[in-house]
């Protein structure tokens, strides 16, 4: 295994992100690495196909304000300074890859639900990151079927 100097933790800021963060923190400790955290907000126009007959700018601002607060709170639990917190707008797969590359990350740590069937065919954020990243990707299994007590 390579030495990881910079680790990019991609989170959706749900409770499941804590398990992913725990694994990223293990890498930080093992390699004495620098931890960055990225959260991507998908613009409502992308999420709803762009044909929304109303102005969503106020809603988008509220989502951004909440995301900023949650990211700061989440980052504080891991002692990650604001300079290594990345809140980005766009498609999660491509923005996580781009942010990791810009930060010089050696590995991206992302949660994976291990979906099957239709969800697998449609793809997932973890799958998109895995196939497009120029660095290592660690997909941490998360979900309701997890029997491991944390």
Task: Pin down the residues of each PLM region.
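General small-molecule cofactor/ligand-binding pocket signal
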Residues: 36-38, 84-88, 138
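Short, hinge-like loop/turn segments at secondary-structure boundaries
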Residues: 52-56, 102-103, 126-127
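Intrinsically disordered or low-complexity boundary/linker segments at protein termini
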Residues: 1-19, 131-150
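Glycine-rich, Arg-bearing micro-motifs that act as flexible, cationic patches
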Residues: 107-128, 146-147
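Small/aliphatic-rich secondary-structure junction motif
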Residues: 2-51
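Acidic, proline/glycine-rich short linear motifs
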Residues: 39-66, 146-150
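Structural beta-alpha unit
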Residues: 1-2, 30, 75-108, 145-150
């Amino acid at each position: 295994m390579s030495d990881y100097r910079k680790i990019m933790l991609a989170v959706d800021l749900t409770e499941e992100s804590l398990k992913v963060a725990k694994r990223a923190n293990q890498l930080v400790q093992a390699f004495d690495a620098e931890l960055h955290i990225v959260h991507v907000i998908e613009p409502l126009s992308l999420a709803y196909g762009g044909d929304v007959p109303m102005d969503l700018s106020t809603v988008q601002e509220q989502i951004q304000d909440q995301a900023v607060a949650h990211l700061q709170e989440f980052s504080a639990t891991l002692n990650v300074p604001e300079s290594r917190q990345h809140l980005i707008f766009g498609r999660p797969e491509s923005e996580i890859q781009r942010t990791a590359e810009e930060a010089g990350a050696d590995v991206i740590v992302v949660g994976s639900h291990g979906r099957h069937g239709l969800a697998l065919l449609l793809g997932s954020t973890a799958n998109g990151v895995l196939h497009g990243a120029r660095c290592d990707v660690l997909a941490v299994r998360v979900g309701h079927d997890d029997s491991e007590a944390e």
